């Protein structure tokens, strides 16, 4: 007969208070998955561009609709957020930014930077006539 050994249990997720850094780590993973599916849409656009005017017009009709622009806007944000969050992880890999204040500053920088760069990129795209 085997003897049961009482081992300590790992704390459940409910034992932790969710911090911004934890939430951003989860969002980094989610944006990575979103980029995978968004890249399929990008490939669809490139294949349509190579296939001819009819196929390209179909893709343009979708991406110029409200839902299409919302998806492209989300893809842009996911790309820029994932990029900046990746830089944050790279800084950590170098051994910097682990103090609570530094960690929070990097996290806020990635969050605000991703949103700001997305908005600036879309403003620039519309300014040069990309939003026709």
Where are these regions (language model features)?
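Membrane-embedded alpha-helical bundles that constitute the cytochrome b-like, heme-associated redox core
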Residues: 1-132
């Amino acid at each position: 007969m085997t003897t049961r050994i009482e081992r300590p249990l790992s704390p459940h997720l409910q034992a932790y208070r969710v911090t911004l850094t934890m939430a951003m780590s989860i969002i980094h993973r989610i944006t990575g998955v979103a980029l995978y599916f968004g890249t399929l849409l990008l490939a669809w656009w490139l294949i349509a561009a190579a296939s001819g005017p009819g196929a390209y017009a179909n893709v343009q009709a979708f991406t110029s609709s409200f839902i299409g622009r919302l998806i492209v806007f989300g893809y842009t944000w996911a790309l820029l957020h994932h990029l900046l969050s990746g830089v944050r992880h790279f800084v950590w890999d170098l051994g910097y930014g682990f103090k609570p204040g530094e960690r929070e500053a990097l996290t806020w920088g990635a969050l605000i930077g991703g949103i700001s760069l997305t908005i600036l990129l879309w403003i620039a795209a519309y300014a040069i006539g990309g939003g026709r």
